[in-house]
Amino acid sequence: MKTIEVDEDLYRFIAGQTERIGESASDILRRLLLVDNQGTVPIEEIVEPKGIVVSKEVGFTPEKFDGVKEMRSLLISDEFASLKKAIDRFMLVLSTLHKIDPLSFSEATQVKGRKRVYFADNEATLLANGNTTKPKAIPQSPFWVITNNNTSRKRQMVEQLMSRMNFQAELIEKVTGSI
């Protein structure tokens, strides 16, 4: 196994391409580069270098999402406006936050209540913290969230999540007010 250093933006892009919990960076890169592990040809190893530094000058530009623009677009979208239930708006907001920045979302989901775990990477973890938590999978993400709380608590959860993801207070207020 070799170690390489990558810029933060490239790291976030690679982390954002994760399809399942536990997928290694090598697996993600193989999938993205369409490299089949069986068809690799052994290459003579050079022992001297201890690591490879990859810089952003390589010319690779990862897909970037403007978080503020994405969230504002969500709030004015027909899809969001058509949702009548707070739980549906809550789930769409969570899914969008994950799409914008999967790595920050993952770090921010460490939010916990005094007695409850709000987010987990599997249903069993949430059920272990209470049989009445009504866990639901967050669409297009590997995460689960508890849903048997009132709208005020859902707003607090989104507020904490967005704060940890470094969104501005004004936008956080607009998003939480729309749930």
From Swiss-Prot:
Keyword annotations: Cytoplasm, DNA replication inhibitor, DNA-binding
Compartment list: Cytoplasm
GO terms under biological process: negative regulation of DNA-templated DNA replication initiation; regulation of DNA-templated transcription
Highest taxon of source: Bacteria
Stored Gene3D superfamilies: Met repressor-like, Replication modulator SeqA, C-terminal DNA-binding domain
Keyword DNA-binding included in the entry's annotation: yes
Main localization of the protein described in the UniProt heading: cytoplasm
Cross-referenced InterPro entries: Arc_rbn_hlx_hlx, Ribbon_hlx_hlx, SeqA, SeqA_DNA-bd_C, SeqA_DNA-bd_C_sf, SeqA_N
Entry's Gene Ontology molecular function annotations: DNA binding
Assigned GO CC terms: cytoplasm
Function of the molecule: Negative regulator of replication initiation, which contributes to regulation of DNA replication and ensures that replication initiation occurs exactly once per chromosome per cell cycle. Binds to pairs of hemimethylated GATC sequences in the oriC region, thus preventing assembly of replication proteins and re-initiation at newly replicated origins. Repression is relieved when the region becomes fully methylated.
Family per record: Belongs to the SeqA family.
NCBIfam families in the record: PRK11187.1
Description of how the protein assembles with itself and partners: Homodimer. Polymerizes to form helical filaments.
Protein name: Negative modulator of initiation of replication
Originating organism: Vibrio atlanticus (strain LGP32)
